[in-house]
Amino acid sequence: MVCLKLPGGSCMTALTVTLMVLSSPLALSGDTRPRFLWQPKRECHFFNGTERVRFLDRYFYNQEESVRFDSDVGEFRAVTELGRPDAEYWNSQKDILEQARAAVDTYCRHNYGVVESFTVQRRVQPKVTVYPSKTQPLQHHNLLVCSVSGFYPGSIEVRWFLNGQEEKAGMVSTGLIQNGDWTFQTLVMLETVPRSGEVYTCQVEHPSVTSPLTVEWRARSESAQSKMLSGVGGFVLGLLFLGAGLFIYFRNQKGHSGLQPTGFLS
């Protein structure tokens, strides 16, 4: 069984553990006696995978940090006077100090190996769509929206091109938005005045794909759009008539095949 470890060797299902210690047992509603909070927080900072790892073991009292262990320092240090006795005591205990120093490997690198396959190595390809924010005639100010959604990890590069040339002015981005399901989304907008015949391209680079994703938006005049819609409508109408004709033909054929010559015994 593979499990996440806490400093000290015990297996847990969380990387960060919060321990709350109250001054008395849970009180009934209406009890106004003071409460006191003691909270340890353990952090692993990874640089270039596990090439360099920094471990922090931090302790808070009433939301104020009092003492910490930093693997880059190698011992406990008091952050406030309240934490000085703890720092001095833990540094005097050889087993506690050795355990904290070893946590870079026994805690951080161990847990990195457990979760790496579904966190660091996880890849989800983005979905890209392009559309104008407003429906209006050409040669009017508009905002072209490149919607990039459902991707992981969050490192992504979105660029706009006009007729093959990169556009850097007039770009507005929402930044990364977390979807709450381990995926991200972002909107990158381009302020422009579209003219007939222009081709706008949104290009997306992401670790989940080997080559950039591109989606085009072509500026068309109202007459060109109406011609295109008429063509599509005529094509769909033709398919409907073709389907109806084939249906009638095969139905008639089936009816004729069921007739038998007079006097024929089967």
From Swiss-Prot:
Changing residue 55 to Y: In allele DRB1*03:01, allele DRB1*09:01. It is a single-pass type I membrane protein. Residues 1-29 form the signal peptide. Changing residue 59 to R: In allele DRB1*10:01; requires 2 nucleotide substitutions. It is found in: Cell membrane; Endoplasmic reticulum membrane; Lysosome membrane; Late endosome membrane. Changing residue 42 to F: In allele DRB1*01:01, allele DRB1*01:02, allele DRB1*09:01 and allele DRB1*10:01; associated with increased risk for rheumatoid arthritis; requires 2 nucleotide substitutions. Changing residue 42 to H: In allele DRB1*04:01, allele DRB1*04:02, allele DRB1*04:04, allele DRB1*04:05, allele DRB1*04:06, allele DRB1*04:07, allele DRB1*04:08, allele DRB1*04:10 and allele DRB1*04:11; associated with increased risk for rheumatoid arthritis. Changing residue 125 to E: In allele DRB1*01:01 and allele DRB1*01:02. Residues 30-124 are annotated as: Beta-1. Changing residue 100 to R: In allele DRB1*01:01, allele DRB1*01:02, allele DRB1*04:04, allele DRB1*04:05, allele DRB1*04:06, allele DRB1*04:07, allele DRB1*04:08, allele DRB1*04:10, allele DRB1*04:11, allele DRB1*07:01, allele DRB1*08:01, allele DRB1*08:02, allele DRB1*08:03, allele DRB1*08:04, allele DRB1*09:01, allele DRB1*10:01, allele DRB1*11:01, allele DRB1*11:04, allele DRB1*11:06, allele DRB1*11:19, allele DRB1*12:01, allele DRB1*12:02, allele DRB1*13:05, allele DRB1*13:07, allele DRB1*13:12, allele DRB1*14:01, allele DRB1*14:03, allele DRB1*14:05, allele DRB1*14:06, allele DRB1*14:07, allele DRB1*16:01 and allele DRB1*16:02; requires 2 nucleotide substitutions. Changing residue 40 to G: In allele DRB1*07:01; requires 2 nucleotide substitutions. Changing residue 39 to E: In allele DRB1*10:01. Changing residue 29 to A: In allele DRB1*01:01, allele DRB1*01:02, allele DRB1*03:01, allele DRB1*03:02, allele DRB1*04:01, allele DRB1*04:02, allele DRB1*04:04, allele DRB1*04:05, allele DRB1*04:06, allele DRB1*04:07, allele DRB1*04:08, allele DRB1*04:10, allele DRB1*04:11, allele DRB1*07:01, allele DRB1*08:01, allele DRB1*08:02, allele DRB1*08:03, allele DRB1*08:04, allele DRB1*09:01, allele DRB1*10:01, allele DRB1*11:01, allele DRB1*11:04, allele DRB1*11:06, allele DRB1*11:11, allele DRB1*11:19, allele DRB1*12:01, allele DRB1*12:02, allele DRB1*13:01, allele DRB1*13:02, allele DRB1*13:03, allele DRB1*13:05, allele DRB1*13:07, allele DRB1*13:12, allele DRB1*14:01, allele DRB1*14:03, allele DRB1*14:05, allele DRB1*14:06, allele DRB1*14:07, allele DRB1*16:01 and allele DRB1*16:02. The chain crosses the membrane at residues 228-248. Residues 249-266 are cytoplasmic. Keywords: Adaptive immunity, Cell membrane, Cytoplasmic vesicle, Disulfide bond, Endoplasmic reticulum, Endosome, Glycoprotein, Immunity, Isopeptide bond, Lysosome, Membrane, MHC II, Signal, Transmembrane, Transmembrane helix, Ubl conjugation. There is a cross-link at residue 254 (Glycyl lysine isopeptide (Lys-Gly) (interchain with G-Cter in ubiquitin)). A peptide antigen binds at residues 86, 90, 110-111, 122. Changing residue 262 to R: In allele DRB1*03:01, allele DRB1*03:02, allele DRB1*11:01, allele DRB1*11:04, allele DRB1*11:06, allele DRB1*11:11, allele DRB1*11:19, allele DRB1*12:01, allele DRB1*12:02, allele DRB1*13:01, allele DRB1*13:02, allele DRB1*13:03, allele DRB1*13:05, allele DRB1*13:07, allele DRB1*13:12, allele DRB1*14:01, allele DRB1*14:03, allele DRB1*14:05, allele DRB1*14:06 and allele DRB1*14:07. Changing residue 177 to R: Decreases the interaction with CD4. The beta-1 domain is a structural part of the peptide-binding cleft. It contains one alpha helix and 4 beta sheets, respectively forming part of the wall and the floor of the peptide-binding cleft. The other 4 beta sheets of the floor and the second alpha helix wall is formed by the alpha-1 domain of HLA-DRA. Forms hydrogen bonds with the peptide main chain via conserved amino acid in most HLA-DRB molecules. The polymorphic residues accomodate the side chains of the peptide conferring peptide specificity to distinct HLA-DRB1 alleles. This is HLA class II histocompatibility antigen, DRB1 beta chain. It comes from Homo sapiens.
